[in-house]
Swiss-Prot record:
Its main location: cytoplasm. HAMAP family: RdgC. It is found in: Cytoplasm, Nucleoid. It holds the Pfam family RdgC. One of its GO terms (cellular component) is cytoplasm. May be involved in recombination. Belongs to the RdgC family. It comes from Pasteurella multocida (strain Pm70). GO terms for biological process: DNA recombination; regulation of DNA recombination. GO terms for molecular function: double-stranded DNA binding. This is Recombination-associated protein RdgC. Keywords: Cytoplasm, DNA recombination. NCBIfam families: PRK00321.1-3, PRK00321.1-5.
Amino acid sequence: MVWFKNLMIYRLTKALDWTADSLQTALQQCEYHPCQQSDMSKFGWTNPLRGTEMLHFSVGKQILLLAHKEEKILPAHVVKAELEQRIELLEQKENRKLKKVEKQALKDDVVSMLLPRAFSKNQQTALWIDTENQLIYVDAASSKRAEDALALLRKSLGSLPVVPLSFANEPSVIMTDWINKDQTPAWLMPLEEAELTGSQDSGIIRCKQQNLESDEIQTLLNAGKFITKLSLAWEERLSFILNEDCTLKRLKFADQLREKNDDILKEDYAQRFDADFVLMTGVLTQLTANLLEEFGGEKARL
């Protein structure tokens, strides 16, 4: 099962109307197929649960999708070396300088020649659609990767009205108060990692293995620094980095949580996949609800 390592959360501004069959049909329009010899890249949906033909995995009102991107790796210096050699030979042969359009045509030939021998870089991005709460969670550490996956879903469905989830109260202000006033919510425990910043000219201070209750940190906060990233733990469930933009990074689920389904035989892969998905989505749904409560709910959209 794909245990999410990062969370970028999006609000569906309009409910999606689909059935399991219509969703499968829509996803098949953008199904992933491996690169052929002449392909630079391929991007599409693959099976979340291996061994099945379904391009989505559903339990109740929770849906899991898996986007697969394959990119051929052609080092620029390899292309450049081969291209320069060909240009030199042709210019000597014809005793003239090649035009720009001719050089581009040669470059295209070089790329076509090298592609079949190029290695592939494969990357998968998981998306979880919570149709009950109208949220989409993307396991991505960068906005571009998340937006690429959402664009693929939008292409498959025809439309996808989403906006990033935002809290009503500024996370940096609230997180700073937690540490400055020693008032972290009872269900959360601050760990020894944070990032602080002030004005644009004051730079960024990154703290690791640092007691956030220390005099050094208090001095920085009293001087007007704000906490923009904070490492937190939810006891017996998971730890994560909470960012000021409402994204979560470096999710690490507690061993005692991940072991809850160990009574299911390893041979029964589908049942374990199902149970782990239910477990993970249950924890993250509650985490989202808790964070929304701590930060004053969801920011009103204009």
